[in-house]
Amino acid sequence: MIHFFHTLQGEKNAGFDVLYHNMKHGQIATKELAEFVRERAAIEETYSKSMSKLAKMASNGSPLGTFAPMWDVFRVSSDKLALCHLELMRKMNDLIRDINKYSDEQVKIHRKTKEEAIGTLESVQSLQVQNGHLQKTREGYHSKCVELERLRKEGVPQKELEKAELKCKKAAESFAGSIEKFNRAGGDFEQKMSESAQKFQDIEEAHLRQMKLLIKGYSHSIEDTHVQVGQVHEEFKQNVENIGIENLIQKFTEQKGTGKERPEGPVGFEEYLSSLASENSKKSRAKAFRIPGLGKRDKEPDSTVHVYFLQNNSPLEVDDEGFVIRADVKQNDIEKEGNFYSSDSDFDDEEPKKFHIQIRPVASSNRSNSAANEQELKATVGALTLPPNRVVSVKKQLSRRSEGEGESVPQRVIAKVEVCACRLSSTASGSDALFGPPLESAFKSHSFSGREQLQNAFAASEFFSKFYSSSLENVEDSGLDSPSHQPLGVSPDPTGWAAWPSSQSQSKDSINAASQSRGGSNRPTPSPNPAPSSQSNTEWMNDIIREGPYSQIMQDSSERLALAPPRSVRSKRSSVAITRKNSDFSRSLCSSPLPDPNASTCVLYSKMLNCAPAGLSRGPSPISLSAQESWPVAAAITEYINAYFRGGEHNRCLVKITGDLTMSFPAGITRIFTANPNAPVLSFRLVNISRVDHFLPNQKLLYSDPSQSDPDTKDFWFNMQALTLHLQREAELNPQASYYNVALLKYQASSQDPSRAPLLLSAECQRSGTVTRVSLDYHCCPATAPATQLTSVQVLLPLDHSATDLQCQPPAAWNAEERRLLWKLDDLSSVSGSGTLCASWQCLEVPRGPAPSLAVQFVGSGASLSGLDVELVGSRYRMSLVKKRFATGKYMAGCSL
């Protein structure tokens, strides 16, 4: 290898100056490299923003036509490409920080080298001075010699000749002294220059190695991005192939279909009825301008004719609740039930139509209660109002619906009355018979959790018994889900995109299904149990949750609260786990005293509802659908420590820590993920992982970046589609749960450092004949558990079957069947966490086997032994709780003899 010392000697000894300035040029190269990488990061950021704009353009694509679902494919692909280049920009910024850090270290090294090279600089200057003196003395000596030779040839007097010889001798002595000084300075220069040249060479080699490492990181980041871009492109092609033409057409028909009902058959001839001509002419009054065929009277048969034939041809039937059952219920009545807003042009000019409701409550032992309940029912019906944005009297609304709906109108009215009345009183003896079951019974088929059902957030934590990988390795970076837009069914799975129908279309399907089921027969069969009431209660609460009034109640006025709740849709995916907030709310409504019958029940309901804060849950993690509030999650870190202390020395031990990370999601967030397929990606970061040796993540739920350079942190983010499916499965298996635990990863750490163990042990065994004495010294390690306490501390010592005459200090419990001693110690901490245990016994024979070992058990909370911690990345989610706990596995101490 070429060395600076051999090649930078040269004329006038300028090699030192060349080496010093070359070292300074290294700083310039470092700064220029940082500027180059910064410019590349700016280019990547600009490209990422451009791709985000392109994704936004795709998301704003026309939702009309069969091609509309394909825009999701373009949006997801553009989002992922933007994420790839944004990630490259982040890596470039990290690289710039590394370059700047190296530049600072480089300045310190150069400053230190300059201080050390001052001696070399002085030797160079001294050598140059001595070289000048040497040249002068040489020239003086030579001139004196020439002068002496000239005088000798000229034959000058002896006296002058002696003077010339004396001057020549002095010049020779001066020249000899200069030679000696020059040689001495040259030797010093050679030694110091050799050392300095070696230092400069080491600095330059280290500089070039570091620069190559930085360039390699730059190249690796670009290569990873190119791989990710290739994966995104392959996924794009696969998604385009998966979404076939038939699927696009099917999705269009599901969303835009108008039904399979065909027009009625040929219309027959109808005879003229003169007896009803006057009534028909009276009923035909309408507005001056009216399109034929679109009015209500053109669409529906006359209610008077219907009543006439009903009275003359069939007897009236009365169900168990006292309502008159009419003979026919029109098919289109169901459609009217699902639509509050009528577009009939002649609605305002119609006169109110009268209908009769006959209430016959179930017989009760207390007749006064029945009469009071009837009065309360009348007051409640009088207080009912119409749906939002519809200022029409109850009388006109009821009369309008009575024209063609038959008995379905009073059934719906009484169903709504039952909801309000059930909230007002649960103490009246006849309330169940008159108004149906209480409000709580409407939720028996839904995920409803009361206060008594709420448990500790991690009490029932269950972990996966087996993960999806058999090797301890990192998660491959294959998903690249956008943090802002989760793909709606765009995945290599051919059925993935169609497995997430929109809530709107699903609700319409549910309405049609419910309408067909309710309107299938012309005459409903009476049943002893008020099924319509229970169904109405359930649908009413489902609709409140679906429409999201809790998020709007605080913003609207009390006038809005008094409006009747809209009709609902029962859907399989619309079931919601209502936690403690709704539990308290419903309990306070049902336990309130019975009010004055003349009071407005809905006004009382609105006052009670106004006291409840906005949101869907008030358990350990409140859920709100507001875009400004973050969604809560919780995490649990559980660790098990195994340790073995060799006999007599607490600083000789083997420690192994295994841990699990579990994340807990409130039940309400499942509905949010289902209703919002573009929910932000949940990301979290593990910090203080330098002591962890291996990670085993859940590869079906998590993604990570294997090229992260920080050895103390590791980032993960969720596959949101897989997470949503997992939470839905958990909700189906346990619909009453208020939270769902998801096991994320396992990890392992091993060490021979005694400071990693929270409790240090040192055991000794002394044998004297048949007597054996065992002592155990223990004390807490302050470096491991400075802020936590060890609880439930137990020490076990197994004994030989022939042991007798036991003596223990402090006293221990003796288990004769298992033949072991058990000490139960107080809680230990770093302040008061040391002590000694002693036990002695006598054997029938002299013991010759190995010394016994002691086992220790304890638990702790509030800290992790590995130091690992978890934090969320981003502001859309918040960590409401991080619970840390640890326990012992095999925690043993061997005795030294």
UniProtKB/Swiss-Prot annotation:
It comes from the Eukaryota. Residues 630-894 form the MHD domain. GO terms for biological process: BMP signaling pathway; clathrin coat assembly; clathrin-dependent endocytosis; convergent extension involved in axis elongation; dorsal/ventral pattern formation. One of its GO terms (cellular component) is cytoplasm. Keywords: Coated pit, Coiled coil, Endocytosis, Membrane. Belongs to the FCHO family. This is F-BAR domain only protein 1. It comes from Danio rerio. The gene is fcho1.
